[in-house]
Structure formats: structure tokens, C-alpha cells
Amino acid sequence: MATVSAAAATSVVARAVLAGPLGLPQMRARRSERVRCNYSKEAATPAAAVKGAGASLLAMAATAAPAMALVDERMSTEGTGLSLGLSNNLLGWILLGVFGLIWSLYTIYTSDLEEDEESGGLSL
């Protein structure tokens, strides 16, 4: 089994420098390191292979959870990002129609009310 490993010879030194027109600090890194990469066709030890497989499985499970989410007709529109949870355009027109009907009935009702001096325009 082939293995690939990488190791840094020295560390990166970073320091904040105040420069630029906005006066914001900039991070600069001094690159005095070399990266060494090794490749060998020798078989890895079984314990190391099992640990590596477990780590890669854990990383895959942690990042793939959103991709494995179940979205179908049984869930309707929960979590699908549709506005107001409307899966059908007809539902939007029904909501708009009911709102318009109630608003028009309220407007007609309030136009028939008599305003007197005591209410001061604050009548229900």
C-alpha cells in the first residue's frame, strides 16, 4: 500500500504590520521553511491503516450529513427554503384572496360607523 506523508522543517513566523491607506494591520509571513513530501510503496502497518480509515470515515460522516438529508413529498416544504412554505402557487393565491376578502369586509364595516366628538377619530 502506498503512503504519502508531509512534514514542515520549520515554523512560520507571522507579525502584524501597520501599513496601507486604511491603517489596518496586515499579516505577513516569513517563508523560511521547506516542505518535504515522501512517497513509499511499502505496506503501512495494520494499526495505522485502521486509524486512518476511522478518521477518514468520521470526516466523511461529518461533512456529508447535509447531502444525505431526506427531502421528498412526505416532508412537504419543511427545510426546503420555499417562502412561506408554499409548495404550490395556488396556495399563494388563496392566501392573497383571503387577506383581500377580510380587508375589504373590514373597510366596508368601518365606513358605516358614525364618528362622534367623543371618539376623536379613535373608534374601533
UniProtKB/Swiss-Prot annotation:
Annotated organelle transit peptide span: 1-36, 37-72
Cellular component terms (Gene Ontology): chloroplast thylakoid membrane; photosystem II
A GO BP entry: photosystem II stabilization
UniProt superkingdom: Eukaryota
Subcellular location: Plastid, Chloroplast thylakoid membrane
Record membrane topology: Single-pass membrane protein
Keywords, alphabetical: Chloroplast, Membrane, Photosynthesis, Photosystem II, Plastid, Thylakoid, Transit peptide, Transmembrane, Transmembrane helix
Function: Stabilizes dimeric photosystem II (PSII). In its absence no dimeric PSII accumulates and there is a reduction of monomeric PSII.
Subunit structure: Part of the photosystem II complex. PSII is composed of 1 copy each of membrane proteins PsbA, PsbB, PsbC, PsbD, numerous small proteins, at least 3 peripheral proteins of the oxygen-evolving complex and a large number of cofactors. It forms dimeric complexes.
Protein name from the UniProt record: Photosystem II reaction center W protein, chloroplastic
Gene, per the UniProt record: PSBW
